[in-house]
Regions:
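Terminal, membrane-proximal amphipathic helices
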Residues: 1-46, 87-142
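A generic alpha-helix surface/boundary motif
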Residues: 31-32, 49-50, 63
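Betabetaalpha-Me/HNH-type nuclease active-site subdomain
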Residues: 45-48, 56
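Membrane-inserting effector segments that mediate pore formation, membrane fusion
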Residues: 53-82
Length: 142
């Protein structure tokens, strides 16, 4: 039987003490947030494909900053994308509650999302557009 992907993520990031380790440790919780949002009836329907894209991005072995090459540090782009999508969801839903009720971590989710988005350049450099192109963001937005 295959383990749940969030459990595999936990194993992969546990014990990581390198650059951005505080954020890398949140990868499993952010992945779980995306999966739970899909089941939330308050998720604006037009955002479902974007949420699905953020989940798929986590699972893809060869993304913009691949884990295969960078180890756990390679999750920074996945984490950024989840934060970007989560922020879009809360803005479109018109409430933080949709994120709060689907969050499964001790760290408060809203400040975490804001911290990740404010750290964009430090986390992913100038790769935001490449990540958005990779998931087909423009097509998902139409």
């Amino acid at each position: 039987m295959m383990k749940r992907f969030d459990k595999l993520l936990e194993k992969e990031v546990s014990g990581y003490k390198g650059k951005h380790s505080d954020l890398i440790s949140k990868a499993p919780a952010l992945y779980k947030l995306m999966t739970r949002l899909l089941d939330d009836p308050a998720l604006p329907g037009r955002l479902s494909p974007l949420v699905i894209a953020s989940i798929a991005y986590f699972i893809l072995p060869e993304d913009v900053i691949p884990e295969e090459k960078y180890g756990p540090l390679g999750f920074v782009d996945d984490i950024f994308l989840c934060a970007f999508v989560a922020d879009k969801v809360r803005k479109e839903a018109g409430t933080d509650d949709i994120l709060i009720r689907n969050w499964d971590d001790k760290t408060p989710v809203i400040p975490l999302i804001e911290q990740i988005l404010e750290s964009e350049e430090e986390l992913i450099g100038d790769n935001k557009q490449i990540i958005m192109d990779y998931i087909g963001y423009e097509q998902l937005e139409t």
